[in-house]
Amino acid sequence: MRLWPLSNDIKSKQFIKIFKRSDGEYESMIQRVYAGLRKLECGADITIATSKSQVSLIHNQLGCDVSVCVEPCRRDTFPAIVLATAYLHDVKGIAEDEVAVVCPVDPYVESDYFDALEKLGALAAAGGANLVLMGIEPTYPSEKYGYIIPTGREPVSGAEAFKEKPDAETAREYIKNGALWNGGVFAYKLGYVLSKAHELIDFEGYEDLYEKYGELEKISFDYAVVEKESRIQVMRFAGQWKDLGTWNTLTEAMGECFVGPAMLDETCSNVHVVNELDVPIVCMGLKDAVVSASPQGILVSDKERSGYIKPYVEKTDRKVMFAEKSWGDYKVIDVGQDSLTIKVTLKPGQKMNYHSHSRRDEVWTVIHGEGRVVIDGEARLVGVGDVVNMPAGCKHTIEALTELNVIEVQLGKDIDVRDKVKSKGGSDEEA
């Protein structure tokens, strides 16, 4: 919400592509962190714990081979970490004496952070503590993080106390006394968390835990485990660490003044533009401003005022206009009284699931690439200029033989995303 219009209900901040790579392409925070983890010499086995709504987007940005542990519903960090730990042990076959390092995917970090993660894992493997936390040296009195009060100022020390997210004045006092940010980065042996989990939850293994997940108490890992653990170590980290959760912090991390088609004249000062549309944005005479455009909407704001956007976004009541899926993406082009027009892009080798609709007809027009459609069990090849009609009730899917662009027109009095019945013969992905 705070990064509207780039983020929305199904696309959170970690998926926004604003970081320019050496090849000129842009990547998101999750792509950046995932790439950093893959470069580690330890050859870590990486699994992403996430909600069901984010799986397609993760596969779109990281590939379909990435390991994902899916929460059936949101139950806070303790159940999520226990579920992921059980997944690593029971599904992936990782031994109880192996170490897991937990870290968020959305901070802005540099290469020294990934080196620090390896050190964190090595400390946990050494067995000097049941939990090893990364304490981040604060750069300002943040109200967004909890704080760790270490027992000393050594690179690795014990933990004296843990503090909840404070107000700015209290945070200043914590920092004066040597407190560190608690960024939610820690390491442990799988057996330790599984043992703690069995003390608090009645379950037999991953499958049983997954079935009972919706009944679990909503409780944080800090409260359930960290604050009660006496054998704990804190490893200091003094490198770059930023939460890019506001337009101010996001634009500070941008390597250039604009992303996407935009022009700024010489009178602009401290202005950043992120444009996901195909039409250009021209800025003249602006100061301390952020301009952002996406299919979801357009924001023009003073940077300081951009933090107060939430109540205005809540009033827009606009449907999701763009989404990335494991098979590609779609963008809403036009919303009519009895029609919805969408541009669909499928990656080579990908396909929609085999499905039907009861209250709408659909028409596909291929505008780029080659593919294969299946209509009520009958398959045929399609290419540029081909039109496929699908009346309500017929089962249909389309597979991309090359990258495929299709204009989809939905026709009906009551067009609803829930009007969809999956059938055997297609992929398991949500279209």
Segments (PLM) and residue ranges:
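C-terminal structural segments of small proteins and small subunits
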Residues: 407-415
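Residue-level signal for inorganic ion chemistry
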Residues: 15, 30, 84, 106, ...
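Left-handed beta-helix
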Residues: 188-388, 394-397, 415, 420-430
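Conserved core of the sugar-phosphate nucleotidyltransferase
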Residues: 110-216, 233
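Conserved N-terminal catalytic core of the sugar/cofactor nucleotidyltransferase
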Residues: 5-9, 19-104, 108-115
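A structural signal for isolated positions on well-ordered beta-strands in alpha/beta enzyme cores
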Residues: 45-47, 101, 132-133, 233, ...
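Catalytic metal- and UDP-sugar-binding loop of GT-A-like glycosyltransferases, i.e.
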Residues: 103, 366, 409
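Short N-terminal binding/cap micro-motifs at the start of the first secondary-structure element
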Residues: 1-5, 417
